[in-house]
């Protein structure tokens, strides 16, 4: 259940989530209809078989999960059937259907195929830190994160969440760290980075599995390249890649964090899930607060 990526948003800490368990059932995920392409709604963080519990709260952390069902209609299949239909009409009527007629034919085919299409299920998890006013979505896609914000908005009626905004240019901070400026306490460089020329269409250099402080890196910095992605390690607990878009990718929980689970005395699957949720939430909070200071992240009003 550990998150692998983090797309972060901020929201005012004054928001009231006390009625969340009452507000979620009306926007629970419903099965995608025969003539629908997709369906979205909340599901239980504990899995689709759990129908009663649609959220999970532990102290100031709230766990929400948006589920999805999408019909799979391969474009190649639709286009192949469309061409056959067009050929039949051309042979029968001696003319080839125009653009509008082809669009109608395609829409008819899709409606015909939808009830028989396979359904792909998905889930996107999010943790809300109610004390510090941020939400961490388990995705590297901004669009996926925005979709989760939209679902929460639909449940609450209003949810003024905004993407992270840094008061200093993230590229400048990341470039400074790799150039030798002191990192925040507990943070150290990993073995991966991406550097770009600041000009449009400029060169891109990707480094992996190598020391990030050395002559090779220095030459790229001297040539004016800026760091757009940087691998970092937080103590022995987390490793991740921070982008200049403020998205955290390749998040991994290390032994320093996982060892805490081994000392848990709770038994049972739900107790283990609770322990993992508590650990993950606390580590993400620690990382967020560190980045909030280092990058001067704006607060939501």
Curated annotation (Swiss-Prot):
An example Gene Ontology biological process: regulation of DNA recombination
Task: Please give the Gene Ontology molecular function terms for this protein.
Answer: double-stranded DNA binding
Q: Which residues form the signal peptide?
A: none
The protein's matches in InterPro entries, at most eight in alphabetical order, are given as:
RdgC (IPR007476)
Record keywords, A-Z: Cytoplasm, DNA recombination
GO annotation, cellular component aspect: bacterial nucleoid; cytoplasm
Give the location in the cell.
Cytoplasm, Nucleoid
Q: Which Pfam families match?
A: RdgC
Q: List the disulfide bonds.
A: none
Q: Which NCBIfam families does the UniProt entry name for this protein?
A: PRK00321.1-5, PRK00321.1-6
Q: What does this protein do?
A: May be involved in recombination.
The family assignment reads: Belongs to the RdgC family.
User: Any idea what this protein is called?
Assistant: Recombination-associated protein RdgC
Q: Which organism is it from?
A: Xanthomonas axonopodis pv. citri (strain 306)
């Amino acid at each position: 259940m550990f998150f692998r990526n983090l797309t972060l948003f901020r929201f005012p800490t004054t928001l009231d989530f006390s009625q969340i368990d009452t507000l979620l059932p009306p926007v629970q995920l419903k099965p995608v209809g025969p003539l629908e392409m997709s369906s979205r709604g909340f599901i239980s963080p504990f899995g689709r078989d759990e129908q009663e519990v649609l959220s999970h709260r532990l102290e100031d952390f709230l766990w929400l999960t948006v589920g999805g069902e999408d019909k799979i209609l391969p474009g190649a299949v639709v286009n192949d059937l469309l061409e056959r239909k067009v050929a039949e009409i051309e042979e029968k009527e001696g003319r080839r259907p125009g653009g509008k007629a082809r669009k109608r034919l395609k829409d008819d085919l899709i409606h015909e195929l939808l009830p028989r299409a396979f359904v792909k299920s998905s889930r996107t998890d999010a943790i809300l830190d109610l004390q510090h006013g941020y939400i961490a979505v388990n995705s590297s896609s901004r669009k996926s994160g925005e979709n989760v914000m939209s679902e929460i908005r639909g449940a609450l009626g209003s949810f003024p969440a905004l993407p992270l905004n840094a008061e200093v240019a993230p590229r400048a901070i990341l470039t400074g760290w790799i150039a030798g400026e002191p990192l925040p306490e507990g943070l150290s460089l990993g073995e991966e980075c991406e550097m770009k020329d600041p000009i449009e269409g400029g060169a891109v250099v990707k480094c992996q599995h190598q020391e990030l402080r050395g002559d090779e890196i220095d030459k790229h910095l001297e040539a004016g390249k800026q760091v757009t992605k940087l691998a970092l390690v937080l103590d022995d607990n987390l490793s991740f890649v921070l982008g200049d878009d403020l998205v955290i990718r390749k998040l991994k929980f290390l032994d320093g964090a996982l060892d805490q689970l081994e000392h848990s005395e709770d038994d049972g699957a739900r107790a283990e899930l609770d322990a993992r949720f508590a650990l993950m939430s606390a580590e993400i909070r620690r990382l967020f607060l560190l980045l909030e200071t280092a990058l001067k992240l704006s607060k939501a009003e």
